[in-house]
């Protein structure tokens, strides 16, 4: 199976060698092009030199011009050639040599978008939220599932995903809308509304770990709140119950594992998420 790979980079001098190694060791796929959109920083020249020596493709973006949607859209429109494009972020670590094969195999003209399983190796709250949001069973979602699932029907991730490029081009990708987050969710809703399916591929795994401070978490959810206000097409889908369900899931699992740091952190963590989201929605109105 022939694929292209897109991996946006920022200040990636220390990671670039391992990123390329992990991509090139993938099995059962023929990698046609590896494309690195590079947001300019002080170490960009060294990163670009390494990319050139590795025979990969790149283009540069000024920091003030970067957007999650437009940068990926440019890669798809102007640089990719294969029907299937795997997108991955620089902090998603691929340990399984068949990860790209699993996620690329899930994509076709009827299922034009798929996202993989993310694993956190830090025993923090994210460890449990990953377990909840990225289960052990692969599944597909289509329009008939939306009423039951609500906002979760459009859950998606740009950390590790695959696109069927012919349809992406045909329907206009992210519609040339600049987005600093959730472009994957925007696209998932778009294809489901048009009668296509999205897929979650549990066999396609990456390690993707964070350890956000409460301030960082608040800012992240503040930005999410702003985004949802700017995209009112999501207003009709309930999300409160899923948030409460996630909090109770983390509490139960942390209690079962006697994870005291997580139990102490849980209330301020969830409060930071809630207040950030609420403030973001209020400010942007």
Task: Annotate each predicted stretch with a short phrase.
Residues 23-60:
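Acidic donor-binding segment of Leloir-type glycosyltransferases
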Residues 62-80:
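Glycine-rich, basic loop-to-helix element that forms the pyrophosphate-binding segment
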């Amino acid at each position: 199976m022939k694929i292209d790979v897109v991996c946006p980079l920022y200040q990636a001098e220390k990671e670039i060698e391992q990123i390329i190694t992990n991509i090139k060791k993938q099995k059962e796929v023929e990698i046609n092009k590896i494309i690195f959109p590079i947001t300019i920083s002080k170490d960009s020249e060294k990163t670009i030199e390494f990319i050139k020596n590795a025979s990969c493709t790149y283009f540069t973006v000024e920091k003030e011009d970067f957007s999650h949607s437009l940068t990926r859209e440019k890669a798809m429109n102007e640089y990719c050639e294969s029907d299937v494009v795997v997108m991955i972020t620089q902090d998603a670590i691929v340990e399984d040599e068949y990860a790209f094969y699993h996620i690329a195999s899930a994509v076709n003209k009827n299922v034009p978008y798929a996202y993989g399983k993310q694993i956190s190796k830090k025993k923090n709250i994210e460890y449990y939220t990953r377990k909840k949001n990225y289960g052990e069973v692969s599944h597909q979602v289509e329009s008939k599932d939306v009423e039951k699932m609500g906002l979760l029907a459009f859950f998606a991730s740009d950390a590790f995903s695959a696109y069927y490029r012919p349809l992406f081009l045909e329907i206009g990708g992210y519609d040339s809308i600049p987005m600093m987050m959730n472009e994957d969710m925007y696209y998932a809703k778009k294809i489901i509304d048009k009668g296509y399916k999205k897929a979650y591929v549990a066999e396609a795994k990456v390690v993707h770990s964070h350890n956000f401070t409460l301030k960082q978490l608040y800012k992240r959810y503040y930005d999410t709140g702003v985004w949802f206000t700017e995209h009112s097409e999501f207003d009709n889908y309930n999300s409160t119950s899923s948030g409460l369900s996630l909090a109770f899931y983390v509490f139960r699992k942390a209690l079962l594992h006697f994870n005291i740091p997580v139990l102490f952190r849980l209330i301020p963590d969830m409060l930071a998420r809630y207040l950030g989201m609420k403030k973001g929605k209020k400010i942007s109105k």
